[in-house]
From Swiss-Prot:
<dbReference type="InterPro" id="IPR020855">
    <property type="entry name" value="Ureohydrolase_Mn_BS"/>
</dbReference>
<feature type="binding site">
    <location>
        <position position="183"/>
    </location>
    <ligand>
        <name>Mn(2+) 1</name>
    </ligand>
</feature>
<keyword id="KW-0479">Metal-binding</keyword>
<comment type="pathway">
    <text>Nitrogen metabolism; urea cycle; L-ornithine and urea from L-arginine: step 1/1.</text>
</comment>
<dbReference type="GO" id="GO:0005739">
    <property type="term" value="C:mitochondrion"/>
</dbReference>
<keyword id="KW-0056">Arginine metabolism</keyword>
<feature type="binding site">
    <location>
        <position position="311"/>
    </location>
    <ligand>
        <name>substrate</name>
    </ligand>
</feature>
<protein>
    <recommendedName>
        <fullName>Arginase 1, mitochondrial</fullName>
        <ecNumber>3.5.3.1</ecNumber>
    </recommendedName>
</protein>
<feature type="binding site">
    <location>
        <position position="187"/>
    </location>
    <ligand>
        <name>Mn(2+) 1</name>
    </ligand>
</feature>
<dbReference type="GO" id="GO:0033389">
    <property type="term" value="P:putrescine biosynthetic process from arginine, via agmatine"/>
</dbReference>
<dbReference type="GO" id="GO:0030145">
    <property type="term" value="F:manganese ion binding"/>
</dbReference>
<dbReference type="GO" id="GO:0000050">
    <property type="term" value="P:urea cycle"/>
</dbReference>
<feature type="binding site">
    <location>
        <position position="185"/>
    </location>
    <ligand>
        <name>Mn(2+) 2</name>
    </ligand>
</feature>
<dbReference type="GO" id="GO:0008783">
    <property type="term" value="F:agmatinase activity"/>
</dbReference>
<keyword id="KW-0809">Transit peptide</keyword>
<keyword id="KW-0464">Manganese</keyword>
<feature type="binding site">
    <location>
        <position position="183"/>
    </location>
    <ligand>
        <name>Mn(2+) 2</name>
    </ligand>
</feature>
């Protein structure tokens, strides 16, 4: 299914429900049942995985993959909705070994586990709108976090998912986090094209909600006047690529999370120069090298409590899946930061 088809499918289903003259009460009941079933699915999977980890013992924190295949809040292409299964395939494809660079073994369930995807399309097919859909994503993340020692590592999807995920993490932990955000764009518009949940507005929602104390944005090279003004409004630390050579030493020795509930890392694949990751919706030359990103991640000091990898667009990837492998490696190295 193409990206446009995925984005318009929800409209077709809403029209069909309207044409069928489904009553508002019946539709509401149906939506509630679908949402409840979705949360039950995630809850039971998380409980199953956590019971195994508790039985095995010797683990304080385990990275837990949760897919959120949502792409309709993208302002350009909606292919990121198809990313989670492609990333999983690349993680386990066998072309590389199962260890992270820091020596964590991904085949050990105490290091990495997986509870599958939030059924976003099925929820949207019954007419659920974005306010409620964002709540479903948040509740799914909280459901994972209820099962100690699981910590969510979320596979997007477009960048709009970061708002409900960070909100859930902050609410569940009882306070704000520090965020390291790697991206070509600041994603801090108050609203983009009238959409407050746009992938270009996720960090405005996070900051106005008080879910982050510090927000560091690294890799920025496509920023408007509003992006800079919003950054100043929220006290965001924006590190643009035009000054990266000067900022490199600082960014490769970050210490975050003291005095708050931990560190959240959000990686938009387009933070990378398109020479390393062409499979993105918004190709922006002049980005970070893959080793730049790994140096920042590996050297970061702080308790990483959750994270996401977003905006990989399989529909723009190379034939051999180069960007899928890049996204998979990002997941592997984030797993090493989260698991303990």
């Amino acid at each position: 299914m193409g990206g446009v088809a995925a984005g318009t499918r929800w409209i077709h289903h809403v029209r069909r429900l309207s044409a069928a003259k489904v009553s508002t009460d019946a539709l509401e009941r149906g939506q509630s049942r679908v949402i409840d079933a979705s949360l039950t699915l995630i809850r039971e999977r998380a409980k199953l995985k956590a019971e195994l980890l508790r039985a095995l013992g010797g683990v304080k924190a385990s990275a837990c993959l949760l897919g959120v295949p949502l792409g309709h809040n993208s302002s350009f292409l909606q292919g990121p909705a198809f990313a989670p299964p492609r990333i999983r395939e690349a993680i386990w494809c066998g072309s590389t070994n199962s260890s992270t660079e820091e020596g964590k073994e991904l085949n050990d369930p105490r290091v990495l586990t997986d509870v599958g995807d939030v059924p976003i399309q099925e929820i949207r097919d019954c007419g659920v709108e974005d306010d409620r859909l964002m709540n479903v994503v948040s509740e799914s993340v909280k459901t994972v976090m209820e099962e100690d020692p699981l910590r969510p590592l979320v596979l997007g999807g477009d960048h709009s998912i970061s708002y409900p995920v960070v909100r859930a993490v902050s609410e569940k932990l009882g306070g704000p986090v520090d965020i390291l955000h790697l991206d070509a764009h600041p994603d801090i518009y108050d609203a983009f094209e009238g959409n407050i949940y746009s992938h270009a507005s996720s960090f405005a929602r996070i900051m106005e909600g008080g879910y982050a104390r510090r927000l560091l944005q690294v890799g920025i090279r496509s920023i408007t006047k509003e992006g800079r003004e919003q950054g100043k409004r929220f006290g965001v630390e924006q590190y643009e690529m035009r000054t990266f050579s000067k900022d490199r030493e600082k960014l490769e020795s970050l210490k975050l999370g003291e005095g708050v509930k931990g560190v959240y890392i959000s990686v938009d694949v387009d933070c990378l120069d398109p020479a390393f990751a062409p499979g993105v919706s918004h190709i922006e030359p002049g980005g970070l090298s893959f080793r730049d990103v790994l140096n920042i991640l590996h050297n970061l000091q702080g308790d990483v409590v959750a994270g996401d990898v977003v905006e990989f667009n399989p529909q723009r990837d190379t034939v051999d899946g180069m960007t899928a492998m890049v996204a998979a490696k990002l997941v592997r190295e984030l797993t090493a930061k989260i698991s303990k």
